[in-house]
Design a protein with these regions (language model features):
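Bacterial Sec-dependent N-terminal signal peptides
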Residues: 1-30, 551
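Phosphate/ribose-recognition catalytic cores of enzymes acting on nucleotide-derived substrates
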Residues: 97
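Signature for the C-terminal beta-barrel architecture of outer-membrane proteins
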Residues: 22-28, 37-54, 64, 69-70, ...
Length: 551
């Protein structure tokens, strides 16, 4: 607890002093501070982590002056929180990103760590998500040029970050976008044809030692008489493993009068899939297809999305694993819930073979006489199957979610919401019911409470920490005093198998751009998701301090 207190005082001091320094010369300084620290306490029902304290910290500073900008980000893991072990072994403080950029009317160039995305990210996306412990920025150079409003061309080259270190892999790519609507002077529509190329290169000499073991294959006597040694790269290449993997993408974007149509197809060359099979050198080509059709009119909107993936997991380093080991973006195309029980067992993308999609509908009915009264209706359906058929010629179900929610603003003081979700994820089926009510006492004070119930259909004789473990009940009570204070208590109780309470309580204080949150509770093992990408988090009990500030 002493380390937790000292850290809070230090970061609060930095936040206060930094917020006063916004102008430097003719330029502008901006930045942010984020700290997430947990002191793990003993718990008879949950094993306490070996290290009783963890802290993930980030400090980012940017400077801009006219067309010039630059920035850095420092990360400190003191040590890393449980579940983020890939980020650091023990204590680590390092420069995680830096950049210098020049931007003109039609031209820009950036040297440093690149965060970018081609199209929908199926072929390439570099980004940071601290909740997932994810940062695959590209250290190198990126340049872009706009030929008026008609053509945009950009290219990049660099080495990607793999957790706290840079990989020995090299990535290069180019992206082209042509606006046919502007060329045809059709101002009423959006019509773009786009394409991308991405190459990942890793020297075969960087392959792990087990691939260098010629005893794995008696016929692997590839001997170099000049050096008197085995030629390991040639040996590895004899299994079909190549240093280069290429991805090609074609895209179409169309929009007119509330209608949007988007499509993308990606072809991926032969890639090595670590851990997919015991056979050394398992290589496979891949492809992805994505289609979206949406329409909105006044208070009504509908969006239908389809996607198929076949061997599209594209690792930064094909010989390693982990959520952060990826150069492309393959999120789950399912509804992302914020309610506890609805998000108990989220869908995990099967990048090497899935087929499915989702449909999302929204409608809002507003009172013509009272702006404080309205109805919001929302329905969503998503389903995914294995790409390849089974022995009976049918595709096995991976996921299905049918859900509907209704929100009602009754007057200035009362608002309520009801949600129902049916989820089927191969291992079990669940019916989830949620009630959410908010009462505003005045302009500042409000009280919100939730009640949730999960009715499970899984086999109660077999369960583990990653399944629903039978029925669940949950509740939350939150009291807010805007714009500064918020207090909450919540509990999630398993009434089907473990009979365990997962309780949590805390408060937050916000002042200008600084927010401090302190909480204590027991957290269930499971997946934490952000933007459709999930990371496994082990169970723990502890005191959690979060500080965020920007200037």
């Amino acid at each position: 607890m002493r380390r937790l207190t000292l850290l809070l005082v230090a970061l609060a001091s930095v936040a206060v002093s930094a917020s006063a320094q916004k102008v430097l010369g003719n330029g502008q300084v901006s930045g942010s501070i984020e700290s997430n620290s947990i002191y793990y306490t003993p718990d008879k029902k949950i094993e306490r982590p070996e290290d009783h304290f963890g802290s993930n910290n980030y400090i980012k500073v940017d400077y801009s002056s006219g067309r010039f900008s630059a920035g850095i980000q420092m990360n400190a893991f003191l040590p890393a929180l449980v579940g983020y072990e890939e980020l650091a072994d023990g204590y680590k403080f390092y420069l995680s990103s830096k950049y210098i950029q020049w931007r003109d009317k039609n031209f820009e160039i950036l040297v440093g760590d690149i965060f970018d995305q081609f199209g929908n990210g199926l072929a390439f996306r570099s980004f940071e998500d601290r909740q997932l412990g994810f940062n695959n920025s590209l250290e190198g150079v990126r340049a872009a040029y706009n030929f008026g409003r008609y053509v945009t061309l950009k290219g990049m080259y660099g080495r990607p970050r793999l957790y706290t270190e840079y990989s020995k892999t090299w990535v290069r790519g180019a992206d082209l976008s042509v606006s046919l609507a502007d060329i045809m002077k059709a101002s009423a529509i959006t019509f773009n044809i786009e394409g991308s190329y991405v190459n990942r290169y890793q020297s075969l000499s960087q392959a792990p030692e087990y691939l260098h073991d010629t005893n794995l294959d008696p016929a692997a006597g590839i001997f170099n008489p000049e050096t008197g040694e085995f030629d390991y790269p040639t040996y590895i290449e004899s299994y079909g493993i190549k240093p280069n993997v290429n991805l090609y993408s074609g895209r179409l974007n169309f929009g007119w009068n509330g209608l949007t149509v988007r499509g993308e197809y990606v072809h991926k060359g032969n890639d090595y899939f670590f851990g997919e099979t015991d056979a050394i050198g398992k290589t496979q080509k891949g492809w992805a297809a994505l289609g979206e059709v949406g329409y909105n009119y006044k208070t009504f909107s509908v969006m239908a999305t389809f996607r198929a993936l076949d061997h599209m997991a594209t690792a930064i380093d094909p010989y390693q694993a982990g959520t952060g080991n990826s150069i492309n973006y393959l999120p789950a195309l399912t509804r992302q819930y914020t309610y506890m029980l609805a998000n108990l067992n989220p869908y995990q993308v099967k990048a090497n073979g899935e087929l499915g999609g989702q449909i999302d509908l929204c409608y809002s009915y507003r009172s013509k006489t009272d702006r404080y009264r309205y109805w919001n209706f929302h329905a969503n359906f998503s389903t995914f199957y294995k790409l390849k058929a089974n022995g009976e010629g049918k595709r096995d179900l991976l996921w299905r979610d049918i859900n509907i929610d209704v929100e009602r603003q009754w007057n200035k003081k009362w608002k309520s919401a009801l949600l129902y979700s049916y989820q089927d994820n191969m291992d079990n089926q669940a019916h989830i019911f949620v009630g959410d009510v908010t009462h505003k006492f005045n302009r500042k004070a409000s009280l919100r409470f939730e009640v949730q119930y999960l009715l499970s259909g899984d086999d109660k004789s077999e369960w583990d920490g990653l399944h629903s473990e039978g029925d669940w009940v949950a509740g939350l009570l939150e009291f807010s005093l805007a714009p500064h204070w918020s207090f909450y208590v919540q509990d999630m109780y398993n009434i089907g198998q473990s009979k365990t309470h997962y309780y949590n309580g805390g408060f937050s204080y916000t002042h200008n751009r600084t927010r401090v949150q302190l909480s204590y509770g027991r957290n269930r093992a499971g997946y934490i998701c952000s933007g459709g990408v999930c990371r496994y988090s082990p169970a723990y009990t502890g005191v959690n301090l979060v500080l965020t500030s920007s200037f």
